[in-house]
Structures are given as C-alpha cells and as structure tokens.
Amino acid sequence: MKKCMLAIGSMSDPYIPLENNIQNVRKALILAQQYGFGFTLITKSNRFLRDLDILKKINQKTKVVVQMTLTTYDEQFCKKIEPNVSTTKERFEALKILHEANIPTIVWLSPILPFINDTKENLQGI
C-alpha cells in the first residue's frame, strides 16, 4: 500500500476542549503510527503536547509536521480575539518543545487584519 501524509485541523482546531475527554485526535495519531502514515497537525492549541509521545514515534518512522498560527504578540489582545485557545506565549513555548524533539514545525502569521494587528510593532513582536 502506498503511504501518504494524513492531515487534521485545516478547517477547525482539532484540540477543542471536548478532545480532553474523547481523545479522538490521540486515537487517530495511534492509528497513523500503527499503519505507517505521516501526519500533519494544524492547531492553535498547546494541548497537542499530551500526544507528544505518539508524534515522536510517527516522526521516527515517517514524518510529522505541526503547524501553528500566531496572530498577535499582545497576550491580552490574543485572549480577546482568540478565546479558548493557547496564547501566543504558550504556542511559542510548545513550538520550542517540538524543536527540541526534532519535530518539524510551520508557523503561520494569520490572520493579519487591517487596522487591528497589522502594525509594525505587532509583526516585529511576533
């Protein structure tokens, strides 16, 4: 069977609060690891750290890529425009953990909203 990369999170964040209970993302990662598929995870949450053990296993056999979006360096503003997700600082810390685990990451600066977070100060702060 030809292998490919599976992806989750392109339309909505897979690590919603309910995921703490149902653990569907973890189950999907386990299946990907068992069958030898790579995995791309797109999230604004640091909750994926719960599954770091499986992400490392997948990355050893095939490849894992974690993509995260950064919107603003202002933590209070982040909490207002992106409630219920990890703050920029928490995401940055999670990205450092992934780097230390040799897991490739992609960072998106998005959305860039005119007159809201498109300032030079914000972009340099991120």
Model-derived regions, located:
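Conserved AdoMet/S-adenosylmethionine-binding subsite of the radical SAM
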Residues: 1-126
